[in-house]
A protein has these predicted regions:
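Two-component/phosphorelay signaling modules centered on CheY-like receiver
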Residues: 36, 160-178, 219, 244
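Two-component system phosphorelay core
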Residues: 1-151, 267
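Acidic catalytic/metal-coordinating carboxylates
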Residues: 180-184, 208-212
Length: 271
């Protein structure tokens, strides 16, 4: 049995997280999504740091920041935000000198998540071993682009945590397909296997980003009702995005109610 007090005593803002997720069941499932993706994100962070590719470094710092905000780890999110901004500003000195602090902070979050999922109780002096078999499997796999369905909603976001959270909310009503970068999204649309009712498009993705997808849709004159997903500190990107034919935007971290509102508005929008 999971003890939410373990999270609270470690500074996790559970109440704020539940405002986004709506209930404990979805919140708990999302912890596993975080664990599924964090090692790859850290690996990419290290890779782009070593390559001095600060733009992509900022993208992965942003992705970990978003996960931390959703899960209620506000202090972790603050550290990640500093690295995201340093990447955008190409502030190599800050990144190099604070990088170990970033890793220690993120690893601390990961440790708390593993202990919580393994059922450790608050105040326990003994950590419960976190075997893979002890941790519940995710309810939604990513990506799910090979599942045929006539009408779908595409959620394009490089974070499995955010994609799976949105899918869990929407799938009782809609068929959801998850993609993790712009190339997957373009390939899926080009394949023509689905009637895409709505596209929720993260602007800040590695490899092929959201703006490349918007440019592709515009150049091919493909009419897909599209709303963007972006960070609250991306005003320039938002202004640029609204030069394209988009319906609305979701600002991370968005709640269940905000997601449902934007999906309904986008789905019913007449292009």
């Amino acid at each position: 049995m999971k003890d939410v007090n373990l999270l609270k005593t470690n500074g996790v803002d559970v109440d704020k997280a539940l405002e986004l997720f709506g209930d404990m069941e979805i919140y708990n499932e999302t912890f596993q999504d975080y664990l599924n993706g964090i090692d790859e994100k850290k690996s990419n962070l290290a890779k782009f740091k070593n390559l001095a590719n600060w733009a992509d470094y900022a993208i992965f710092a942003h992705s970990i920041k978003s996960d931390a905000r959703y899960l209620g780890f506000t202090k972790v999110a603050e550290v990640c935000l500093k690295h995201e901004m340093a990447g955008k500003e190409q502030n190599q000195h800050f990144i190099e000198t604070d990088y170990d602090h970033l890793l220690k902070t993120v690893d601390g979050m990961t440790d708390i998540v593993k202990r919580y999922l393994a059922g450790e109780q608050a105040g326990s002096n003994t950590k419960t071993p976190t075997q893979d078999s002890d941790i519940p499997k995710p309810a939604v796999s990513t990506p799910t682009i090979n599942i045929p369905k006539e009408s779908v909603i595409i959620i394009a976001d490089d974070s499995p945590l955010i994609g799976n959270f949105a899918a869990r909310i929407l799938e009782p009503t809609y068929k959801v397909v998850l993609t993790q970068d712009g190339k997957q999204t373009i390939d899926l649309i080009e394949a023509g296997r689905y009637n895409v009712e709505t596209l929720l498009l993260d602007l800040n993705m590695p490899n092929v980003g959201g703006f490349e997808v918007l440019e592709y849709l515009k150049s091919k004159n493909i009419q897909v009702p599209t709303s963007i997903i972006t960070g609250e500190d991306s005003k320039d990107m938002i202004n640029k995005a609204f030069t394209y034919n988009i319906v609305d935007m979701l600002v991370k971290p968005f709640s269940k109610d905000e997601l449902l509102r934007v999906v309904e508005k986008t789905k019913n929008y007449n292009l």
